[in-house]
């Protein structure tokens, strides 16, 4: 039976994906948000989903209302109106927890790599069988006939606790979100609580010391590069400018050679996790092998374009571990080019907590350009940290730039420009693209 769904904050990455999925399942969908453009809204617009400004008149008691986690009565008129008038709504993660009960559900959790791995698993499985999925890049697919549901499982504020999937991957555990988590131990405890809710199979990166301590009632399968102690092992790596080829063994049994057209050691691990899960769930590895070959990645994860013969990479990396992985991928694909990092720190709390780690990660590039720190809506700038504090710790060529003047980036020949961040780093990227386009109109 068709329902009408209203999304408060429909442009959020998870919210937009869920809206698309429900729309494709035959439901009526609309939503509200701020006017500012977000990359997630293009898919909504292409589907013809109405995006309204926030207004209490948008709400109807007959709708099922899903509210973004950032919105409260003190910062959103629709939430305030709903609370005052007894109109019920569910938060995104609450809705998802009940929704997935009707499917064979497969979650992907982890401090880093969730979106890429969810995208890879969704791509492969949806080419094998009818599958609905939610990816953290704002992509969603829904089918009324789907048996399987793949989703991204987010640890922030323990939002993944309503989820009880049959299968789940945990890519890694790392200290992040210092505005919520107090320590690495706090992060571990959240993941360990989540792991106890998996029912059929948990797949964890075996070379992560924290993940080795995870406990679950479901069978735990470890994956990694090292043969000792891991169940699924990737070996015989061949990393080239066209992607990565590797062999996977399961407890000594050769499962064959696989190829992915993506870059970086982290993506080999992501693929090994996907292979392990689908093998354990009983899927034909020949089909898995075939469809891994065609996985091109997800939005804002090593997204490439060429402007005036200049390679520009856009990536969501906003944690030191992610920066290192992205720069490693860039060197694999472009071994003869200079790697220029253009990075915007995201949140003051994260920048303070990980300042030295950010400097170490960015020093993997050949040159570094920094944008001003992008503060979260959840925090206030108390002046405790400035981007210059990070710049002072970088030992490669570096400079702080503004969106109005990105011309210092032109100082490099034969370079790849890697724009990284979770704020509005894309405005710097677009400014640079306009600068390049003004030099010549040759745009691909």
Swiss-Prot record:
It comes from Streptococcus pneumoniae (strain JJA). Its main location: cytoplasm. Gene3D superfamilies: Mur ligase, C-terminal domain (3.90.190.20), Mur-like, catalytic domain (3.40.1190.10), NAD(P)-binding Rossmann-like Domain (3.40.50.720). GO terms for cellular component: cytoplasm. This is UDP-N-acetylmuramate--L-alanine ligase. Pathway: Cell wall biogenesis; peptidoglycan biosynthesis. Belongs to the MurCDEF family. It catalyses: UDP-N-acetyl-alpha-D-muramate + L-alanine + ATP = UDP-N-acetyl-alpha-D-muramoyl-L-alanine + ADP + phosphate + H(+). Cell wall formation.
